[in-house]
Amino acid sequence: MSKEDMIEFSGTVAELLPNAMFRVKLDNDHIILAHTSGKMRKNRIRVLAGDRVNVEMTPYDLTKGRITFRFK
């Protein structure tokens, strides 16, 4: 799947879950399960509850996503 096929949303981290998973409430009021991207893990970027994030999702499964950016 190429980068162009991904769908991007903005949201807020609602809950921290085990195994570096997060429950994210999107701006359109949907709640999804998300994990951090590899570059965020590599650079040790912390994501806490209440943080604004960008989430990348595949059109095939709109209940899971990948956090690609944390806003300051």
Curated annotation (Swiss-Prot):
GO terms for molecular function: ribosome binding; rRNA binding; translation initiation factor activity. InterPro entries: NA-bd_OB-fold (IPR012340), RNA-binding_domain_S1_IF1 (IPR006196), TIF_IF1 (IPR004368). Keywords: Cytoplasm, Initiation factor, Protein biosynthesis, RNA-binding, rRNA-binding. GO terms for cellular component: cytosol. Gene3D superfamilies: Nucleic acid-binding proteins. It holds the Pfam family eIF-1a. The lineage of its organism: Bacteria, Pseudomonadati, Pseudomonadota, Alphaproteobacteria, Acetobacterales. It comes from Acidiphilium cryptum (strain JF-5). It comes from the Bacteria. This is Translation initiation factor IF-1.
